[in-house]
Amino acid sequence: MLILENVKKLYSNNRGLRSTSIQFREGEITGILGRNGSGKTTMLKAILNLLPLDEGWITLHNKPVEEQFEQIAFITEDGSFFPYMSAKEYGEFLTLYYPSFSKKRYFELLDQFEVSIFDTIKSLSKGQQLKVEISAGFAMNAKLIILDEPFTTLDIYAKEDTVRLLIEQVKEDVIILISTHNIEEIETVIDRCVVLDDGMIQEDIMMDELNECGKDLRALLDPYRPAVRK
C-alpha cells in the first residue's frame, strides 16, 4: 500500500499540496485529475521523492518511499531516459541499476510496439520515444507504476496496447497511478478517481460507485470544468 500522511508542500506562490492524507491500494488503477496548479504534479513529485516536503511522510509497503526507488516506475511523455543512447543501450543501462528489470520483457515490448532498438532515442518520434518509456516502465517489475500523460503522443493501436498492459499489471497486485487531461481515454481503465483542486483532494470515488449514481467522469469534473479543460 502507498500511504500519504499529512503531506504538505507549498511554493512561494502558495500553490502546491496542502495537508493531504490518502491511501492507494494494490490491484487498483487510480486516475489523478486536476487543472494546472491543482497540486496534481506536486503530489506525483512528492511520491517520487523529487522534492522535499514541508510536512508529513510517504510510505510504500510500510517503508519510506525514498528507500523504495527500485520499486517505482515513472512513465512520462517528457522522457526520463538518456536521449543519446539507443533503446538497446538504454535497456542494458537499466539492467545495471534495477535488479528486477526484465531485459527480455523490455525487448518483447519494443518489438510489439515496432520500435527500432538501434537508433538513438533522440532520433525517434515523440510517440516512439514514449513507447520506449512504456516498455521500460512495464519491464521493471515495479510495485508502483506512475504514468504522467501516457497517451498524448501515441497512435490508437499503441494506446490499446498500453491499456492492455495496465490491466495485466493490476493482476500482479501493482499500484498504478495515471495523471492525464484525457479523461475519455482512462474512463474505462481506472478503478478509482481522485480530483485535486487548490492543493486539496476534492473528490475520491470508485468508478463503480460513480456509475451506480448514473454519472461519468465528465459529470464528476463538471464543477471544475473551467480548470480541468484547456
Language-model regions: role of each:
Residues 145-149:
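Catalytic Walker B motif of ABC-type/P-loop ATPase nucleotide-binding domains
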Residues 33-35:
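The feature captures the beta-strand-to-loop junction immediately N-terminal to the Walker
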Residues 2, 17-19:
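Conserved structural motif at the start of ABC-family nucleotide-binding domains
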Residues 55-68:
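Conserved ABC transporter NBD signature motif
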Residues 78-123, 129-132:
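ABC-family P-loop ATPase nucleotide-binding domains
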Residues 180-181:
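H-loop/switch region of ABC-family ATPase nucleotide-binding domains
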Residues 48:
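Helix-to-loop junction immediately C-terminal to a conserved catalytic motif
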